[in-house]
Amino acid sequence: MGLFDIFKKKFETVSPEAAKALQENGAVLIDVRESHEYKNFHAPGAKLISLGVLERRLKEIPSEREILVVCQSGMRSSQAAGILSKNGYQVKNVAGGIAAWRRAGLKVVR
C-alpha cells in the first residue's frame, strides 16, 4: 500500500435518483444531519443518525444491507461514508445531499 492509498475513497457516490431507486430495492438511507435539520425536512424512510454519534450507533445499522448516506450538501455524508466503509459496510454517498434530492424533484417529508 502506497503512502497516498489511505486517501482513496472506499465508497461510491450516487445521484439522488439512483439513491432513491436503491432505497426502493432495500438499501437503508441514513441522514447524518442534525435533528433540527432532519425535522425541517428529510427523504421518506430516512433514518436519522447524526454524524457526531455515528460511530457510537453502528450497531443500529444493518451490516447485511447496502447503506446510503445523505446530509445537506454531501460533505458530512462523505465523512460518514468513510466511517461506515472503514467499519465494513457497503456504503454509497448521495451526491449533493438533500439539497440535490430536492432539486431533482424527489419527495421530502416535512
Question: Across the structure, where does each feature detected by a protein language model lie?
Answer:
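Rhodanese-like catalytic fold shared by cysteine-dependent sulfurtransferases
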Residues: 1-27, 35-66, 75-110
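Short, surface-exposed ligand- or partner-binding patches at beta-edge/loop junctions that are enriched
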Residues: 70
